[in-house]
Amino acid sequence: MANKWVYLFTEGNATMRNLLGGKGANLAEMTNLGLPVPQGFTITTEACTQYYEDGEKINDEIMGQIMDHINKMEEITGKKFGDKENPLLVSVRSGARASMPGMMDTILNLGLNEEVVEVLAEKSGNPRWAYDCYRRFIQMFSDVVMEVGKKYFEALIDKMKEQKGVKQDVELDANDLKELANQFKAEYKEKIGKDFPSDPKEQLVEAIKAVFRSWDNPRANVYRRDNDIPYSWGTAVNVQMMAFGNMGDTSGTGVAFTRDPATGEKKLMGEFLMNAQGEDVVAGVRTPQHIDQLKQVMPEVYDQFVKICHTLEDHYRDMQDMEFTIEDRKLYMLQTRNGKRTAFAALKIACDLVDEGMIDEAKAVSMIEPRNLDTLLHPTFDPEALKKATPIGKGLAASPGAASGQIVFTAEEAKEWADTGKKVVLVRLETSPEDIEGMKASQGILTVRGGMTSHAAVVARGMGTCCVSGVSEIVMDEENKKFELGGKIFHEGDVISFDGTTGNIYDGAIATREAQIAGEFGRIMSWADKYRRLKVRTNADTPHDAKKARELGAEGIGLCRTEHMFFEGDRIDAFREMICSDTVEEREKALEKILPVQQGDFEKLYEALEGNPVTIRFLDPPLHEFVPTEEAEIEKLAHTQGKSVAQIKAIIASLHEFNPMMGHRGLRLAVTYPEIAVMQTKAVIRAAINVAKAHPDWNLKPEIMIPLSSDSKELKYVKDIVVKTADAEIAAAGSNIKYEVGTMIEIPRACLTADDIAKEAEFFCFGTNDLTQMTFGFSRDDAGKFLNAYYDKKIFENDPFAKLDQVGVGKLMKMAIELGKKTRPELHVGICGEHGGDPSSVEFCHKIGLDYVSCSPFRVPIARLAAAQAAIAEMNNK
């Protein structure tokens, strides 16, 4: 049987999301629920994938099914494409299985041409509406399908408004719009070199191809990479009969949420515009009215809409984001989906749904996007500083948080300035999808136009970036890079602050303070902890970091990098003395100076962790990272050592390595300079003995981690030194403290010989940053130079340093665990690379049987939640 590439809305349902995309599946589900949905059909995601496999062509089989479904649609609607009596007009929209707001393109009013527009004008008795639809269609088709920029058409509209002495598009009459349509077609011909297509079927095929193509546009690729959406999924295309919101004052269009997407409050939240089409609300060109005002304008429609909102939320058991159109007092539902929301709102909604009996705790934990928790942990304005500040303006509080930075006016500049380390805020009339890179680089986004559902608001909420939109009192001069607000002119580079929770805007910088987390956050986290199996530790080198991580729920330290401690104060001088010493005695003398301060550091860490596990990694970086580069510092070192500057420079030169990442570092340092390992072991054990004495009820068991093993013999050599030193210290103190010696697995050979290495190591911890480097054979610091080309050419979908490569690096990890546990069944295994805080990597760690993940302090809640979600998913799949 031939593949089915096209489905009517009556043939699908919500479970077919992978095939029909989110929008298509939900249109089918709303149809099944008996809601007023303009009918149509969905071309599947598989057809999109096939389109790319066929060299960006729609093959005959798929084309045949599309044409069959056009005929079926004509039968259902009683209208015909290109007909002089009763013409069918459609919208063409994309819809991937994961919601990608603003990433994919829409075309409305398709099916119009010179003849059809005249029929519509005459039949409806509303020529203004007919020509408004036509000029919009030409503009959208030109922009989305043929890539003739919107700006050319906007300029023609502005010119026409100027000639007519009007301010708003809605003030142009039928003749003006008819003239604009002609000007648009002339513009199209000039840019494309051929006439605007008049055959509705040709228009439709070109539009479908454009939606498929937009799956691969640069902004879709960026969004996919940021949100772990595979390229192979493809997008579906929805072809739907038009419902017209621009037929006059009894028509309109809007977007609404069943709960507030910024705060989570249980109240209908949304906006509508009378005499407008769907894109007008989202594009933010005119600032819309609040949904509550629909009650005054059209009470019956409002009541019907509220009822539908309840139906949909009860059905999907989640907050819904809906698009609707009113055509001459008749309500049509164009879309519903689980709404994008801020992290704050997500927690509140999840807890409220549990309290309302709609969902259970496991479902509540599963519906929070772990990465979004980041935003809750970000600073807010300091209340005292805020009291002294006077707002100079106010907009809509579109996405919470506090932003201070230098003003930039374009996305490109935002990225360029941010790359040099500057904090910037992006100020725009309105944002569009191509601004995504600049939006990511900004501390916050401020727009003059647009409402709570504009592109800027939706994308900023998704990214966890502060946003204030609809600041209509700004007088903008983008060309000269300045604007006026509150009686003051602001130029590029000036500093402003704004609050995405209140919408207030301030002149200058305002002090921020650490985020406060409690309430719903605590509830969700306690539920998450009930379900997860993986322990979550933190990477911390200071008591301050350790304390913060404990507050955020860390159950230990998975990685304490001891080298960071050597850079503090005058310790670096002693360490440099050690490096430049000629004899073992001289080195030991220098290390004796470091021992008490290193011991003191460890004592503070043990205190901060209150008896929870602490893994201390011995010295890892190559020695050249510690030597001075400034002339004055070199002279100071020469003086201390009683050597000449030339001798010190010769020592520094001798430390130079061609490939330091694979050079004299890690346990290789301990092999050549065992006295370093001796000093560090003494510091670890003495600190543990002292803290254990002070807190006899704590179960303190230091974990000593030897970095960069590649062979069991080198590990045994270093471990023997550690054990001999530790046992002597414990005996001398008359203590009974226990300790463990393990290793960091970060070289592929260690994974391949893990059965041997486990004879010496009591635990493994995967250092996935280096393991990724060594497995791929590229350096983390240089990979950025070519990774973008790899994304563009579809060789890689993600940065393997941000998201664990499960196929290669993951296979090595799995092998190491299996081999290691054969030798030592009680072996405990963790991960402490940056991947420890990446949700998809945490899920993989759960699957392959790790005992813990360790990540930076602020990612601890993300890892806790991701670990719980992995356990719940496994439970649900059984």
What function would you assign to each model-found segment?
Residues 358-442, 504-509, 521, 525-528, ...:
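Protease-associated
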Residues 330-332, 429-440, 444-446, 452-458, ...:
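Glycine-rich phosphate/ribose-binding loops and adjacent secondary-structure elements
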Residues 1-389, 422-425, 432-437, 443, ...:
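Nucleotide/phosphate-binding sheet-loop regions of phosphoryl- and nucleotidyl-transfer enzymes
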Residues 93-94, 517, 527-878:
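Conserved alpha/beta-domain cores
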Residues 334-336, 491-539, 545:
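C-terminal domain-closing interface element
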Residues 41, 448-450, 469-472, 560, ...:
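Short beta->alpha connector loops at strand-helix junctions that form conserved
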